[in-house]
Amino acid sequence: MWNSGFESYGSSSYGGAGGYTQSPGGFGSPAPSQAEKKSRARAQHIVPCTISQLLSATLVDEVFRIGNVEISQVTIVGIIRHAEKAPTNIVYKIDDMTAAPMDVRQWVDTDDASSENTVVPPETYVKVAGHLRSFQNKKSLVAFKIMPLEDMNEFTTHILEVINAHMVLSKANSQPSAGRAPISNPGMSEAGNFGGNSFMPANGLTVAQNQVLNLIKACPRPEGLNFQDLKNQLKHMSVSSVKQAMDFLSNEGHIYSTVDDDHFKSTDAE
């Protein structure tokens, strides 16, 4: 599953290291105002979308918007209908059944024989993270990550994240600046597997982290919930996803171990 890969909207989604976040300014650029900085920062959020939304996005002053939500970096989930490799790039047609298939271009490093240069075969369901682009009024994605789905629940999760993300961002953007709630920063799930929880809900946790935390909170036993019971209740998640969510919650002070390293209780427990 996708854990904290695009999991919230902050400076960068991948790995939390900011490696994919473009620098807002440039050499010789005038110092931007606070409003400009905030606007540009918002544009760096990785927003879960459908292809239909991307195709209907409007481009004004070099900024894409879906309604009042500014977008630049997005994620989509769909099936590859066609793949074509050229010397410097791979072009996919990806279909999520909300509109016509969309062109997704992934540039390849001709000096690198890594898996990033391997063509993902047609009829494979994938999650794509990339930048929305428009050329001659035709929209496409320039992908910086394409990952085959490991679990078809990720497709359903993505649709829920799309709804949640756009509701939250639309509400946030409609509020006065002074009263706008901060939007937290994303992370990455399993080694590059930008898990199905790209969006962080209001408490700053991913879907997977919230599921783990809520189960631990709900356990009435004094010693807390043990890992085996937790894993059995989260059969839709891989073991590594559960462990990563627990590691994050423990490091952030949401849960703590009790009688041994396999039993956990919430710090909010009575």
Curated annotation (Swiss-Prot):
UniProt entry keywords in alphabetical sequence: Acetylation, DNA damage, DNA recombination, DNA repair, DNA replication, DNA-binding, Isopeptide bond, Nucleus, Phosphoprotein, Ubl conjugation
Residue span of region Disordered: 21-40
InterPro entries: NA-bd_OB-fold (IPR012340), RFA2-like (IPR040260), Rfa2/RPA32 (IPR014646), RPA_C (IPR014892), WH-like_DNA-bd_sf (IPR036388), WH_DNA-bd_sf (IPR036390)
Residues recorded with modification Phosphothreonine: 21
Positions of the DNA-binding region: 74-148
Gene3D superfamilies: Nucleic acid-binding proteins, Winged helix-like DNA-binding domain superfamily/Winged helix DNA-binding domain
Entry-annotated residues carrying Phosphoserine: 4, 8, 23, 29, 33
Residue ranges, annotated region (Interaction with RAD52, TIPIN, UNG and XPA): 187-270
Cellular location(s): Nucleus; Nucleus, PML body
GO molecular function: damaged DNA binding; single-stranded DNA binding
One biological process term in Gene Ontology: regulation of double-strand break repair via homologous recombination
Modification after translation, per record: Differentially phosphorylated throughout the cell cycle, becoming phosphorylated at the G1-S transition and dephosphorylated in late mitosis. Mainly phosphorylated at Ser-23 and Ser-29, by cyclin A-CDK2 and cyclin B-CDK1, respectively during DNA replication and mitosis. Dephosphorylation may require the serine/threonine-protein phosphatase 4. Phosphorylation at Ser-23 and Ser-29 is a prerequisite for further phosphorylation. Becomes hyperphosphorylated on additional residues including Ser-4, Ser-8, Thr-21 and Ser-33 in response to DNA damage. DNA damage-induced 'Lys-63'-linked polyubiquitination by PRPF19 mediates ATRIP recruitment to the RPA complex at sites of DNA damage and activation of ATR. Ubiquitinated by RFWD3 at stalled replication forks in response to DNA damage: ubiquitination by RFWD3 does not lead to degradation by the proteasome and promotes removal of the RPA complex from stalled replication forks, promoting homologous recombination.
Main location class: nucleus
GO CC annotation terms, alphabetical: chromosome, telomeric region; DNA replication factor A complex; nucleus; PML body; site of double-strand break
Modification type N-acetylmethionine: residues: 1
Cross-link Glycyl lysine isopeptide (Lys-Gly) (interchain with G-Cter in ubiquitin): where in chain: 37-38
SUPFAM superfamilies reported for this sequence: Nucleic acid-binding proteins, Winged helix' DNA-binding domain
Family statement drawn from the similarity comment of this UniProt entry: Belongs to the replication factor A protein 2 family.
Function: As part of the heterotrimeric replication protein A complex (RPA/RP-A), binds and stabilizes single-stranded DNA intermediates, that form during DNA replication or upon DNA stress. It prevents their reannealing and in parallel, recruits and activates different proteins and complexes involved in DNA metabolism. Thereby, it plays an essential role both in DNA replication and the cellular response to DNA damage. In the cellular response to DNA damage, the RPA complex controls DNA repair and DNA damage checkpoint activation.
Protein name: Replication protein A 32 kDa subunit
Native source organism of the sequence: Pongo abelii
